[in-house]
């Protein structure tokens, strides 16, 4: 059954997504991540080589797409989290499958989570510069911080940020 799904669906999805990974962009992070998850699950070397060594690989996306202050280059809180939603599953699966994720890129992603927290107001609502949704708080992104806490489990700052978010009195927006 899994072989049929792999050969008839996931290999085809890879063929569809591969040419779309053609620039540094938040959606390309999602494309790379989808390919990475398939590659890890099915132990597909071609998929994993593409994700980690292709021209617009996930490491390059992170290193070139994230500013020095830990924010996605498109300049929107929404795009920053949208990008994190795309990148974080790759980090999680790399951890689960004992893949040596580039330490510098991993540190950049960690910094993205911390920076986003630092951008929030004291009530954990986020500013809305540029394109995005108004009146959003960090509780909206608690699920992605939960994954980050798993990926960075020994990092007390990330774990504490998650606790602060979950214990915030304001409802998820």
Model-inferred region functions:
Residues 36, 78, 82-173:
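Carbohydrate-active enzyme catalytic cores, enriched for enzymes
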Residues 1-78, 82, 88-89, 169-172:
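Active-site lining segments of carbohydrate-active enzymes
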């Amino acid at each position: 059954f899994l072989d049929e799904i792999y050969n008839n669906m996931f290999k085809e999805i890879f063929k569809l997504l591969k040419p779309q990974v053609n620039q540094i962009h938040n959606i390309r992070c999602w494309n790379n991540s989808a390919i990475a998850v398939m590659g890890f699950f099915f132990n597909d070397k071609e998929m994993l080589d593409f994700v980690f060594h292709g021209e617009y690989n996930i490491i390059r996306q992170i290193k070139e797409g994230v500013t020095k202050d830990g924010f996605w280059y498109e300049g929107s809180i929404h795009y920053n989290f949208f990008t994190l939603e795309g990148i974080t599953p790759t980090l999680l699966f790399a951890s689960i499958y004992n893949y040596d994720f580039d330490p510098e890129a991993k540190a950049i992603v960690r910094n993205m989570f911390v920076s986003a927290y630092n951008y929030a107001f004291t009530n954990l609502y986020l500013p809305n510069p540029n394109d995005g949704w108004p009146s959003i708080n960090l509780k909206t992104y608690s699920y992605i911080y939960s994954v980050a806490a798993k990926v960075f489990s020994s990092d007390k700052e990330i774990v504490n940020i998650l606790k602060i978010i979950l214990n915030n009195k304001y409802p998820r927006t």
